[in-house]
Regions:
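Acyl-donor (CoA/ACP) binding surface of acyl/acetyltransferases
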Residues: 1-14, 18-22, 49-52, 56-154
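Conserved GNAT-fold acetyl-CoA-binding loop/helix
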Residues: 23-42
């Protein structure tokens, strides 16, 4: 069963020690685990307008999901997700994590709209966004942009 747990520093290190770039987006940046980078990344995500969660399957961290750019006056935020590697993809885990994040954003944080983006070539990510209720609002040379409103989210 997939659960979301607030990510702490130790969980962040455990996740990124095993993280592998998705081949669909890996050409944008090369990732190598570095403890100093993981500490800085964790610290950057400890600000007021962000919430960082570990995606946990049977006690194992298989991804991270975050809400960022939270605007409590406009009731909007952005959602992002990273899964550990290809071994945990195409099994419904990302879909379930995004459903849980949307539910948290809409029901617990009183958001009206959640935005997201996906690299144009990352067809899996784009499919999952649409599956959980997002619709495409535009594209640029690199990304497709999406939004999900409370009434059409899962």
């Amino acid at each position: 069963m997939i659960t979301l747990q607030p990510m702490d520093r130790q969980m962040c290190h455990a996740f990124y020690r095993e993280f592998e770039n998705d081949p669909a987006v890996g050409h944008y940046y090369e990732f190598r685990y570095d403890p100093a980078w993981a500490d800085a990344y964790f610290d950057r995500n400890q600000i007021r307008d962000r919430l960082l969660f570990a995606i946990v399957l049977d006690g194992r961290i298989i991804g991270e999901c975050k809400l960022k750019d939270m605007d409590l006056e406009k009731h909007t935020c952005r959602m992002g997700i990273h899964l550990l590697n290809d071994s945990v993809k195409e099994k419904g885990y990302g879909t379930r994590a995004e459903q849980l994040m949307l539910r948290h954003a809409f029901e617990n944080l009183d958001m009206e709209t959640v935005f997201a983006d996906a690299v144009l070539g990352n067809l899996r990510s784009r499919h999952v966004l649409q599956k959980v209720g997002f619709y495409e609002t535009g594209q640029d040379d690199t990304f497709a942009y999406y939004r999900c409103d409370r009434e059409n989210g899962t």
